[in-house]
Amino acid sequence: MKLITILLLCSRLLPSLAQEEGAQELNCNDETVFQAVDTALKKYNAELESGNQFVLYRVTEGTKKDGAETLYSFKYQIKEGNCSVQSGLTWQDCDFKDAEEAATGECTTTLGKKENKFSVATQICNITPGKGPKKTEEDLCVGCFQPIPMDSSDLKPVLKHAVEHFNNNTKHTHLFALREVKSAHSQVVAGMNYKIIYSIVQTNCSKEDFPSLREDCVPLPYGDHGECTGHTHVDIHNTIAGFSQSCDLYPGDDLFELLPKNCRGCPREIPVDSPELKEALGHSIAQLNAQHNHIFYFKIDTVKKATSQVVAGVIYVIEFIARETNCSKQSKTELTADCETKHLGQSLNCNANVYMRPWENKVVPTVRCQALDMMISRPPGFSPFRLVRVQETKEGTTRLLNSCEYKGRLSKARAGPAPDHQAEASTVTP
């Protein structure tokens, strides 16, 4: 009897002991659960070449691990929807396909998050086909989008146009270059339609100094990057007659890539206590106090990271923490050395970009800050999930899991009024 009790206890403890050290479990009411899984599922659907999109069914596991970069890990279940991958709809616009014919699957994904944007690092989905009839060659859609080689010469003018369109229609300070083509499809019409998914990366060429992308513009390992989906129509005269593009842009990630040696024009790290930063920091805090409507001045407390980049001048990129001082804007016209930080004053995490051309006495500072203690609050019941207890059996061991079931859509088999149920604050994992 004691042996049985010990075995039962171990079966409950093993899942939690196996959990990655330092990982924090997430609950269904945490808005990052939906944001992260939505990003992962949209990426999976975007990479499908044919068939229907998949719709989120439930999230069964979710953890967050803080470090130099915050990493999120999820396991979620999906079901085939009734919207094709070429429909232009998102998975949230689709309903579940009839249960008998629908494919199902489970995905395991890891995401990074920086400046409130998620990016998928890894993702594996195992799909179980439905019981519906299999498509034959005769069933293939004539005139529908078909996959084409990603290195096709037909794509070169289309991709060149896509990158030029991005550079000409965004407010980013630098030009971007093509990094990689991820998928490409074509459709025969009166001419040709192309749908291409591709990634772009920031170069060292600023728009102020370079009117267009050149061959000597170098992609920056520290630079911003993005993923785009472009739709292009090439008419019968082989002219681009229509184009649309949507891009998700992510801030640069310098955690895993080192700068190449002898990279002219690339940013270089400089010590946070370097005298070289003194002038740039002065412009940064002056800009912060000018644009911030707080009644007290802020001063720089800690410099966390800094880089400089030689262009037509110098660009300093600095991350620092600013703290509220005891000097009010009513009593002083500017921040002075005798202003002291308040012990319980507000703290800001700031990112500054300071462009300096000393021979012209030109300084262009840009500062973005966020309160360190800023918390996003939501009304109760806003979560798109409801808590569901799910029984799982693996290798002879049965356990109950708290899963977050998506309540945005109902399959036809479960059609009817949605229950008036508020998501409970419970963790996703056991």
Curated annotation (Swiss-Prot):
Modification after translation (UniProt): As T-kinin is preceded by a Met instead of an Arg or Lys, it is not released from its precursor by either tissue or plasma kallikrein.
SMART domains: CY
Induction or repression: In response to an inflammatory stimulant. T-kininogen II synthesis is induced and the plasma concentration of T-kininogen I is raised.
Residue ranges of every copy of the Cystatin kininogen-type domain listed in the record: 28-131, 150-253, 272-375
Region (Disordered): 411-430
Keywords: Acute phase, Disulfide bond, Glycoprotein, Protease inhibitor, Pyrrolidone carboxylic acid, Repeat, Secreted, Signal, Thiol protease inhibitor, Vasoactive, Vasodilator
Keyword Acetylation among record annotations: no
Pfam families: Cystatin (PF00031)
PANTHER family: FETUIN, KININOGEN-1
Name under which the protein is recorded: T-kininogen 1
Organism: Rattus norvegicus (Rat)
Lineage: Eukaryota, Metazoa, Chordata, Craniata, Vertebrata
